[in-house]
Amino acid sequence: MPEKPSLANVLSSSGRIKILTILSNVGELHLSEIARKTDQSYSATDRHLQELSEASIVEEHDYGRVRMFRLNLENPRAKILRQLILEWDNSTTPKMIDGQA
């Protein structure tokens, strides 16, 4: 059985975070569209999506020659990441934690 990737590994790349953010907000997108929206090269986007797919965070669907990607919401980790991203994006003011902003 493959080893589960650590949270640090999944979130260690700003490119992967951008991809997760786009997919959390939009849903399913074509690889080229993800690359364009995240301002990354096609090859870098493909590599990040492959890593996220191997971690079962993202799932790929092929429609002929078109490769579409979306979050794998069957995976509890992907659900948690999506919830975190949506909460983070919707938060307009920093919350006070132990007297610190």
Which ranges hold each PLM region?
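Short alpha-helical segments that sit at the start of domains
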Residues: 1-18
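Amphipathic alpha-helical dimerization/coiled-coil segments
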Residues: 1-4, 73-101
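Short capping segments at the starts of secondary-structure elements
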Residues: 14, 26-30
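A short acidic, leucine-rich amphipathic alpha-helix
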Residues: 33-36
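Key DNA-contact positions within bacterial/archaeal DNA-binding proteins
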Residues: 43
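Short, hydrophobic-biased segments on the C-terminal half of alpha helices
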Residues: 46-50
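A short, conserved structural fragment
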Residues: 53-63
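Short, Lys/Arg-rich nucleic-acid/phosphate-binding segment
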Residues: 62-68, 74
